[in-house]
Curated annotation (Swiss-Prot):
Annotated localization: Cell inner membrane
Transmembrane segments: 26-46, 84-104, 114-134, 143-163, 193-213, 216-236
Pfam families tied to this protein: ATP-synt_A (PF00119)
InterPro entries with a match to the protein in the record: ATP_synth_F0_asu, ATP_synth_F0_asu_AS, ATP_synth_F0_asu_bact/mt, F0_ATP_A_sf
Keywords: ATP synthesis, Cell inner membrane, Cell membrane, CF(0), Hydrogen ion transport, Ion transport, Membrane, Transmembrane, Transmembrane helix, Transport
Domain of life: Bacteria
PROSITE patterns, per the entry: ATPASE_A
Organism encoding this protein: Brucella anthropi (strain ATCC 49188 / DSM 6882 / CCUG 24695 / JCM 21032 / LMG 3331 / NBRC 15819 / NCTC 12168 / Alc 37) (Ochrobactrum anthropi)
Subunit: F-type ATPases have 2 components, CF(1) - the catalytic core - and CF(0) - the membrane proton channel. CF(1) has five subunits: alpha(3), beta(3), gamma(1), delta(1), epsilon(1). CF(0) has three main subunits: a(1), b(2) and c(9-12). The alpha and beta chains form an alternating ring which encloses part of the gamma chain. CF(1) is attached to CF(0) by a central stalk formed by the gamma and epsilon chains, while a peripheral stalk is formed by the delta and b chains.
Record CDD domains: ATP-synt_Fo_a_6
Membrane topology: Multi-pass membrane protein
Major site of localization recorded for this protein: membrane
Gene (name only): atpB1
Gene Ontology MF term list: proton-transporting ATP synthase activity, rotational mechanism
Protein name: ATP synthase subunit a 1
Length: 249
């Protein structure tokens, strides 16, 4: 079981909770989502509480994250979109910290669960829909009628735009889930090769050198992927928010 690359994604009930036949158990996924929030909040608190004129390295990282989200949101949705900054920044930090924590031994990668990433994606699209109708009313539906489209093909274009819009939660969630899942499976497979070959003795240890090098390389790549997936998730979120702020553009 220890060498099973899928075992690391198993969901375990830590505190069984059943309410009216609905399973609301506190699981390992729940625990590590809480841990992600605590770590992200603690990091931001520690890095933003300093009063020194010269920022520390960690404070610089925190400021870079702030500037990245602020710039992405401003470039995508303009100044009117900045009201969503706390929401987008919270999403970015949650996904980023969750991805990074999952790379450490004995930590669970919560973003490798499709239900978690889908919930985040639905939260984004739900926010877009609610704000769009709240701010623009039926004018939000202009989003599905691009300007300059000949009247004869408007029904076809509207149908395509609606399908494209409704598929956003799926593409947004699957992209994050699939990348984290595939990367961790690959890493586990190569790490398993190292352990299995090393257990064979001197000859096996010699054969474990290449898988060990690959494991180190994949680990480094996974850190890059962890950041890139948080980056992509945030940029797409900013683009979707622009649809709520400026549906006719």
């Amino acid at each position: 079981m220890a060498n099973d690359p899928i075992h690391q994604f198993q969901v375990s009930r830590w505190i069984p909770i059943d309410v009216g036949g609905v399973d609301l158990s506190f699981t390992n996924v729940s625990a590590f989502m809480v841990a992600t929030v605590v770590v992200a909040s603690g990091f931001l608190y520690l890095t933003s509480s300093g009063r020194g004129l010269i920022p520390t390295r960690l404070q610089s990282v925190s400021e870079m994250a702030y500037e990245f989200v602020a710039t992405s949101l401003r470039d995508s949705a303009g100044s009117k979109g900045m009201k969503f900054f706390p929401f987008v920044f919270s999403l970015f930090m949650f996904v980023l910290v969750a991805n990074f924590l999952g790379l450490f031994p004995y930590f669970y990668t919560v973003t490798s669960q499709i239900i978690v990433t889908f919930a985040l994606a639905v939260l984004v699209i739900g926010t877009v829909i609610v704000y769009g109708f709240f701010k623009h009313g039926l004018g939000f539906l202009k989003l599905f009628v691009p300007s300059g489209v000949p009247g004869i093909i408007v029904p076809l274009v509207v149908a395509i735009e609606i399908i494209s819009f409704l598929s956003r939660p799926i593409s947004l969630s699957v992209r994050l889930f699939a990348n984290m899942l595939a990367g961790h499976i690959t890493l586990k497979v190569f790490a398993g090769f190292v352990v299995s070959l090393a257990a064979l003795g001197p000859i096996g240890i010699g054969g474990a050198v290449l898988p060990l090098i690959m494991t180190v390389a994949i680990t480094a790549l996974e850190f890059l992927v962890a950041f890139l997936q948080a980056y992509v998730f945030t940029v797409l979120t900013c683009m979707y928010i622009n649809d709520a702020v400026h549906p006719g553009h």
